[in-house]
């Protein structure tokens, strides 16, 4: 069960990490990127932000074709920065279980934010992306 106590490294999670919340080449090129909208920050598994980023930002077929390679790169980078005791299988499981985050974000955002044509389309896409990813990985079963 994924909704019980979890072990492993935790980090600062953005919670709404998607392309709309990232600026590139900021401060006149002094910084390569900056991240906006920190209202949903929390502590947890970093794989949640990775999972949400891919479900909210990639077409389903592209995500399916490349997600395991992208998550492996993420895992290798963690190890390169000194994260220990977080094996690939645990990282991949955290990633898959975190797919429900996209569902939560899409639904809760649609409830909390003023409706516009753009926000309706955005939240529908976020929810669909999260649902498809969660179904692809059996994430709802991991939370049972």
What are these regions (language model features)?
Residues 1-2, 15-18, 23-24, 38, ...:
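Tryptophan-centric aromatic hotspots in well-structured domains and transmembrane helices
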Residues 1-14, 25-28, 126, 133-144:
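ATP-dependent phospho-/nucleotidyl transfer catalytic cores
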Residues 6, 10, 15, 43-46, ...:
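Active-site-proximal structural scaffolding
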Residues 9, 62, 66, 87, ...:
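Conserved acidic
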Residues 17-19, 30-33, 92, 98, ...:
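Active-site lining segments that contact anionic ligands and/or coordinate catalytic metals
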Residues 18-56:
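Catalytic activation segment of kinase domains across protein kinase-like and atypical kinase folds
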Residues 40-83, 99-121:
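Active-site activation/catalytic loop segments of kinase-like enzymes and analogous catalytic loops
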Residues 83-93, 102-144:
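Helical subdomain adjoining the active site within ATP-dependent kinase catalytic cores
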């Amino acid at each position: 069960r994924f909704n019980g106590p979890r072990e492993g490294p935790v980090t600062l999670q953005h919670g709404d990490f998607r392309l709309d919340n990232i600026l590139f080449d900021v401060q006149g090129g002094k910084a390569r990127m900056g991240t906006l909208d920190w209202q949903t920050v929390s502590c947890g598994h970093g794989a949640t932000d990775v999972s949400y980023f891919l479900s909210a930002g990639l077409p389903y077929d592209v995500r399916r074709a490349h997600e395991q390679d992208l998550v492996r790169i993420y895992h290798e980078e963690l190890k390169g920065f000194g994260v220990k005791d977080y094996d690939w299988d645990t990282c991949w499981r955290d990633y898959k279980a975190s797919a429900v985050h996209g569902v939560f974000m899409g639904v809760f955002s649609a409830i909390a934010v003023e409706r516009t044509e753009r926000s309706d389309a955005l939240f529908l896409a976020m929810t669909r992306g999260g649902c498809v990813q969660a179904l692809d990985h059996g994430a709802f079963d991991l939370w049972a």
